[in-house]
């Protein structure tokens, strides 16, 4: 039997999603709790591996097991054995053809900026604080230059292991809700640090340090060192993963909880 799970987590206390020796990870906590409920070792595959400090409201995983359990065991039972910062949001038996990573057709991230002169005391690990005056309208205009298929060499980590720098961005929107500025981006897939590097460069435009046309120049230069510094991890959320409709996976509010959809 193959089971898919929807997962939400606060990544601030973990060294990323992927299981690692000697440090805590979201994957390790999920597999530990699942193995306890199943009474056998369980290994999961995920839709997207998030970095240290990055959060998820729409992460999807799958695992295989011959153990017979009601679906509530994979939600309520597993949640009872997880730390407060990790939660199973739904569980569904799926066809063996389903794969959390390879069946996905798109991923969606949201980056939340707290734009205020003073830093926040609450939610400080869930937002990125920038005190300068940000023009979200300029950021949104510049963001449209990312839409479509491009060579994102200037916007991926120098140590990115992907064989190709090309990705297809479906949409990017920059909006403001009071003191919060949100960058919402969806693509077929993402390169390492791609979202945070895009946000870092958009912030330079929103702060008035660069013109909108700078993005076009960066695409042409294909040089990561000439783009802006990588934005901080704590404002980034994996909020949704898209799959073919025939899998009929549950859909929840994108989140994070304190933001309006």
Swiss-Prot record:
Function: Formation of pseudouridine at positions 38, 39 and 40 in the anticodon stem and loop of transfer RNAs.
Classification via InterPro entries: PsdUridine_synth_cat_dom_sf, PsdUridine_synth_TruA, PsdUridine_synth_TruA_a/b_dom, PsdUridine_synth_TruA_C, TruA/RsuA/RluB/E/F_N
Catalytic activity: uridine(38/39/40) in tRNA = pseudouridine(38/39/40) in tRNA
Species per Swiss-Prot/TrEMBL record: Shewanella frigidimarina (strain NCIMB 400)
Active site: 51 (nucleophile)
Assembly information from the UniProt record: Homodimer.
Listed GO MF terms: RNA binding; tRNA pseudouridine(38-40) synthase activity
EC numbers, comma separated: 5.4.99.12
Binding site for substrate: 109
PANTHER family: PSEUDOURIDYLATE SYNTHASE (PTHR11142), TRNA PSEUDOURIDINE SYNTHASE-LIKE 1 (PTHR11142:SF0)
UniProt keyword list: Isomerase, tRNA processing
HAMAP family linked: TruA
Swiss-Prot/TrEMBL GO biological process terms: tRNA pseudouridine synthesis
Coiled coil: none
Gene: truA
Enzyme class: isomerase
NCBIfam families named in the record: hisT_truA
Family per record: Belongs to the tRNA pseudouridine synthase TruA family.
UniProt protein name: tRNA pseudouridine synthase A
